Amino acid sequence: MAEFEIPDFYVPFPLECNPHLEEASRAMWEWIDANGLAPTERARDRMRRTGADLSGAYVWPRADLDTLTIGLKWIALTFRIDDQIDEDDTAERLPARMTAIDELRGTLHGLPVSGRSPTARALGALWQETALGRPATWCDAFIGHFEAFLQTYTTEAGLNAHGAGLRLDDYLDRRMYSVGMPWLWDLDELRLPIFLPGSVRTCGPMNKLRRAGALHIALVNDVFSVERETLVGYQHNAVTIIREAQGCSLQEAVDQVAVLVEAQLHTVLQARQELLEELDRQALPSRAREAAVDYAANVAANLSGQLVWHSSVERYAVDDLQSAADPRATPTTSSLGI
């Protein structure tokens, strides 16, 4: 694959990292081991190289230890799901993928889990722990965003199975959810003094902020991950879509994605200002307003944090792919045993 230069992404927001990272990381690994989520050395090494704990410390920099620990469990679990589907399921058997995703979705609604699925069992138990005592409106918002995240795996497999060409606009609509940020930011509400009022959680400026922030992080991810994803045959990447649609060089496609990243940054700035105006219009009690402003500031800080995370970890390095292709290598556990 041709070499390319990663753009110098500019993000004006302060970098925040959770001071409880070390202690929460230990708890995360204990939970991974207890639930059998890294059953082989290869799977364990992949989790180490991912730095799920560091990513979570940047997602929830203001959370207390207990909230951060819950968050790290979620982020580790979903990185494991992502690896099992995007890299281990090379055959992309659509019916099997649909069955696996349906089982994961069912756990969020209390449906029984098959005995052979450690990931689904862990998801069901983690959701029960997370949802306990939470408002129904928050639970509904989280489930909606998490199901949208899971659905992207089935949608992508369906597009591949039918040989459908990938359009950038359609991809971006999906990418907002496949990157996972909307439900990750739902979890950020757990550390606020009060949950966001429904009128704030679903208002236009908040939706605009959430989408632009998610796409900023997603498009940065596409640049950092394009080499690895190309090598494993994964085509759902903005760089790849632009390159194939325009017949341009890899560097030209990367530079075009950088322009899209900058546009999302401007939208984040605009949406934060519009949110302040919307909060004035709603005339909320001071605690609700403060919670909304705090939540929005955390979304902005995530742009800086996730950029640093991408630059710091080996999740998107490619040196492990050659050893994984060796027939003597230890397999990861499933091709959709999830």
Swiss-Prot record:
Catalytic activity as recorded in UniProt: (2E,6E)-farnesyl diphosphate + H2O = (2Z,6E)-hedycaryol + diphosphate
Cofactor: Mg(2+)
Motif NXXXSXXXE motif: where in chain: 221-229
UniProt keyword annotations, A-Z: Lyase, Magnesium, Metal-binding
Coiled coil segments of this chain: none
UniProt remark on cofactor binding: Binds 3 Mg(2+) ions per subunit.
InterPro entries according to UniProt: Isoprenoid_synthase_dom_sf, Terpene_cyclase-like_2
Residues the record marks as site: Important for the cation stabilization at C-11: F149
Phenotype for F149W: No effect on synthase activity at pH 7 and 8.5
Keyword Repeat set for record: no
Record-level GO BP terms: terpenoid biosynthetic process
Gene Ontology terms for molecular function: metal ion binding; terpene synthase activity
Pathway: Secondary metabolite biosynthesis; terpenoid biosynthesis
Binding site for Mg(2+) 3: N221, S225, E229
Binding residues annotated for Mg(2+) 1, in chain numbering: D82, E87
Span(s) of short sequence motif DDXXXE motif: 82-87
Outcome of substituting S55W: Loss of synthase activity
Binding site for substrate: R175, R228
Enzyme Commission no: 4.2.3.187
Family as reported in the entry's similarity comment: Belongs to the terpene synthase family.
Subunit structure: Homodimer.
Domain notes: The Asp-Asp-Xaa-Xaa-Xaa-Glu (DDXXXE) and Asn-Xaa-Xaa-Xaa-Ser-Xaa-Xaa-Xaa-Glu (NSE) motifs are important for the catalytic activity, presumably through binding to Mg(2+).
Record's miscellaneous remark: The 1,11-cyclization requires isomerization of (2E,6E)-farnesyl diphosphate (FPP) to nerolidyl diphosphate (NPP), the abstraction of the pyrophosphate from intermediate NPP leading to a (Z,E)-hedycaryl cation and finally an nucleophilic attack of a water molecule.
Name of the protein: (2Z,6E)-hedycaryol synthase
Organism: Kitasatospora setae (strain ATCC 33774 / DSM 43861 / JCM 3304 / KCC A-0304 / NBRC 14216 / KM-6054) (Streptomyces setae)
